[in-house]
């Protein structure tokens, strides 16, 4: 799926990480751990083409996506990538349904009708019947579940999740991890930046960003 080769990132003359090498395949869930400021989120952003690495390559289906132009980047994000952001990245003055319908309009391979896909996704995250509520009226945990439902509708090949349980109670955190795990077992590749031991324990491999290097803590693949 994704093969990272000798990736490096320098920010304000500081090397966040260098010579990063790892692979994540379909059906695998990987965790990136490390202290705040170590560059976990930046590494996710590079994988998602939100930032450019300072060096190295990211191979996807035979192409080095770090060399993509704007059109290819947009296509990659639309057709391949799903991102679970720390701040949810939802349209706050729109309803839950309207947020998910943005995804259905972009999906060319959506199974069934858009309305059915949205309803099924909301049911899966425990928000059935809440589609007409505005995002700004929801709690943080509920907003994270809407963002998760967006991934369920999108059905991406690659999911990048940045501290997806960081601000959640135990029940919401468990639901998020369960669904990410289900998505990986369904064939999606999942990479998670996390401090949560419960998340790490569910992953097939765990890598630590430590003193500018990537260290393998666990790999059961």
Question: What residue spans do the PLM features occupy?
Answer:
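Conserved structural motif at the start of ABC-family nucleotide-binding domains
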Residues: 2, 17-19, 76
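Helix-to-loop junction immediately C-terminal to a conserved catalytic motif
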Residues: 48
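Conserved ABC transporter NBD signature motif
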Residues: 56-64
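Conserved ABC ATPase signature
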Residues: 134-138, 142
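Catalytic Walker B motif of ABC-type/P-loop ATPase nucleotide-binding domains
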Residues: 159-162
């Amino acid at each position: 799926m994704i093969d990272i080769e000798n990736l490096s990132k320098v920010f304000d003359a500081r090397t966040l990480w260098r010579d990063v090498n790892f692979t994540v395949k379909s059906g695998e869930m990987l965790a990136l751990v490390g202290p705040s400021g170590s560059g976990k989120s930046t590494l996710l952003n590079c994988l998602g083409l939100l930032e450019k690495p300072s060096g190295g390559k990211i191979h996807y289906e035979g192409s080095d996506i770090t060399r993509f132009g704007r059109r290819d980047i947009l296509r990659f994000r639309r057709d391949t990538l799903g991102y679970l952001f720390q701040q949810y990245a939802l349209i706050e003055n729109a309803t839950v349904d309207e947020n998910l319908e943005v995804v259905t309009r972009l999906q060319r391979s959506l199974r069934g009708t858009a309305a059915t896909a949205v309803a099924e996704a909301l049911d899966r995250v425990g928000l059935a019947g809440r589609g007409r509520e505005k995002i700004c009226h929801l709690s943080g945990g509920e907003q994270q579940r809407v963002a998760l439902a967006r991934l369920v509708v999108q059905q991406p090949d690659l999911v990048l999740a940045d501290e997806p349980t960081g601000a959640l109670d135990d029940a919401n955190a468990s639901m998020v991890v369960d669904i990410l795990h289900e998505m990986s077992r369904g064939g999606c590749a999942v990479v998670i930046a996390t401090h949560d031991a419960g998340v790490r324990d569910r992953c097939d491999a765990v890598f630590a960003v430590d003193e500018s290097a990537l260290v393998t803590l666990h790999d059961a693949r």
